[in-house]
Amino acid sequence: MSGFEQLFAGKLPKLIMFDLDGTLVDSVPDLAVAVDTMLAELGRPIAGLESVRAWVGNGAPVLVRRALANNLDHSGVDDALAEQGLEIFMRAYAQKHEFTVVYPGVRETLKWLQKMGVEMALITNKPERFVAPLLDEMKLGRFFRWIVGGDTMPQKKPDPAALFFVMKMAGAPASQSLFVGDSRSDVQAAKAAGVACVALSYGYNHGRPIAEENPAMVIDDLRKLIPGCLDMDAEILLPDIKRPSSRESIVVVTRKLWMKVIKALARWRWRA
């Protein structure tokens, strides 16, 4: 039985929100290159791929601090050093994504969901400036109507603010929404928003099995959400889902747009 059949009683959700790193793409090799470049410039021993794999998932500033501490616990890292390290890291990571790859089954699943008219959003803790170029390189951007970066809003996952914002934009209640991620912060954000969370077992969760976070379901291939699993021609009973038109297919939620939303809400509250 597919994930959708188990979680939504034979229907599709109206909205699916995805994490990026560790869920749709394996970006650790390029992140590790940038981290090691930063450490080398600061005269510190390089970390290596596996250490970086255990540190990712909470955004670039936290990743840099963990690398400087050589530990998940980064409380003792000097703020000035962290700022310097972050600047070097951001410069190094912006250069290219030579080693990042899309996980097996991701493109097929996104194509199928798009074909079925499901609204999709991307909510990542990756800094906004890196998201669009990476999606372009991986040829994934066209699938998402809403894209929210880690510094787009004042809060990032595990805070559920981005999930609430996207659900509001999509007109989708929590009962018809799904979050797909790979880490503790993803599961916590989904639970805080009242949304079911499907977790990928192959992602980044600081070396801990994601099942320990008690998501609604754990899968090892995104295609297992689909009825018939690997059958891309499968059909399923749909709730009343409106297929988005091509001209309104993508809305990148930038910091500038978010501030406009905040101001509009403030005006509405004042008038009320």
From Swiss-Prot:
Cofactor section: Mg(2+)
Metabolic or biological pathway, per its Swiss-Prot or TrEMBL entry: Organic acid metabolism; glycolate biosynthesis; glycolate from 2-phosphoglycolate: step 1/1
Annotated keywords: Carbohydrate metabolism, Hydrolase, Magnesium, Metal-binding
GO molecular function: metal ion binding; phosphoglycolate phosphatase activity
Catalyzed reactions per annotation: 2-phosphoglycolate + H2O = glycolate + phosphate
Binding site for Mg(2+): D19, D21, D182
Record-annotated active site: D19 (nucleophile)
Family: Belongs to the HAD-like hydrolase superfamily. CbbY/CbbZ/Gph/YieH family.
Described function: Specifically catalyzes the dephosphorylation of 2-phosphoglycolate. Is involved in the dissimilation of the intracellular 2-phosphoglycolate formed during the DNA repair of 3'-phosphoglycolate ends, a major class of DNA lesions induced by oxidative stress.
Protein name: Phosphoglycolate phosphatase
Organism: Pseudomonas syringae pv. syringae (strain B728a)
